[in-house]
Amino acid sequence: MSRRSGRLQSRQDNQPLTECISDENNLPMCTRKRKTREQDTTGVSKAEEVQRRRQQFTIENRWVPISESSSIETSLLVPMQTKEPSTPSEELMDTANWVTFRNLFPAHVSDRASPIPLLHWDDLPEVWTIMTRKEALCPRKHDCLKSHPSLGERMRAILLDWLIEVCEVYRLHRESFYLAADFVDRYLAAKENVPKTKLQLIGITSLFVAAKLEEIYPPKLHEFAYVTDGACTDDQILDQELIMLMTLNWDLTPITVNTWLNAFMQICNAEEIANRKTNFHFPSYSSTEFVQVAQLLDVCTLDIGSMDFDYSILAASALYHVTNEEVTLSVTGLKWDDIAACVQWMSTFAMTIREVGVAQLKNFKNIYAGDAHNIQTHCSSLELLDKSHEKQRLLREASCCSPVQVPGVLTPPQSDKKSKKGVL
């Protein structure tokens, strides 16, 4: 080995590991050790910790006086205040684990079994659970008019009946009307001393918001203002829209009575759906029966007494009056005790409709025939409401005048406890 070769060999032997050496093709090759997995994990956790700490503080600019006539600007780190969730959606997102999430809901909700059959293409029991829990998070307030001395039950009925007419004129879906009715009731429950002069503005604004949510081609703003006959302008509707959205905390997707009715009617045909080979299913139920049940719900919604019941109970009770008890309990997952009170309250409305005549399916121009039953129609709902109230009054008078019927055989009192009055 030559003297030069010996020096090169000793140089390569003493070369540190952090330097790069060359192979026979003169390509650099790094010999530095890679970071271990523990080191990488530590680095990521430190970065996350720094980011978490940054989110706990905010920078606040302040002026610090240095003399009587001058001051300098400085910055301070101020801890951020924890914002409480203001809506049910934020409350759900704020939960840390499943146990906390589950404890947000009443215990009776989980006891309600899902009537939806198990199909191979989706986890339908989970859908049912979400629907029941969402309804439990948004209870209805039956005393929504209590804090409004200038408003009455009749005014609310007239407003909702007028909204039904507007929906039929513009070919709006039933879901749009029931969303608007829900917005009106929730808005009145959250406000106080609303004057009767603003009631029409509240109603048309609710329908304006609902149409934008539900309809593919909702009517224009000026069309909603036009149907008020000059009572509401475009600017007033826009201003009221912002007020209403803030009052409702932007919770605009309740499970309406129309949604429950569609679900129950679809479950009635579960066997037919399960036998199909396709994975995509359209709504499959009788349009005529759906319209009859929807007519009963339209009339009942005008009555303030409907606020005493949840939407699912109203839909199940209306289905009971059109079908029978066996079908209703099987497709709703409810028990008779759950719907008994609502069925009894709704009986006068059902009798009135049977006397006057049930609604028939209407066909609309430029509306697909298979979707015609979903278009909101006006069937003299206010007149049916008045007749139902008259029937309720007559039934109350008859029950007060009739003697009390005591079941079983009456047992006479003992001889020593009989009254001596009138004995000769």
Curated annotation (Swiss-Prot):
Keyword ATP-binding: no
Biological-process GO terms, alphabetical: cell division
Bias (Polar residues) ranges: 7-17
Keyword Amino-acid biosynthesis: no
Pfam families noted in UniProt: Cyclin_C (PF02984), Cyclin_N (PF00134)
Keyword annotations from UniProtKB, A to Z: Cell cycle, Cell division, Cyclin, Nucleus, Phosphoprotein
Residue numbers bearing the Phosphothreonine modification: 411
PANTHER family: CYCLINS (PTHR10177)
Function: Essential for the control of the cell cycle at the G1/S (start) transition.
Protein's recorded name: G1/S-specific cyclin-E
Species annotation: Hemicentrotus pulcherrimus (Sea urchin)
Gene name for this UniProt entry: CYCE
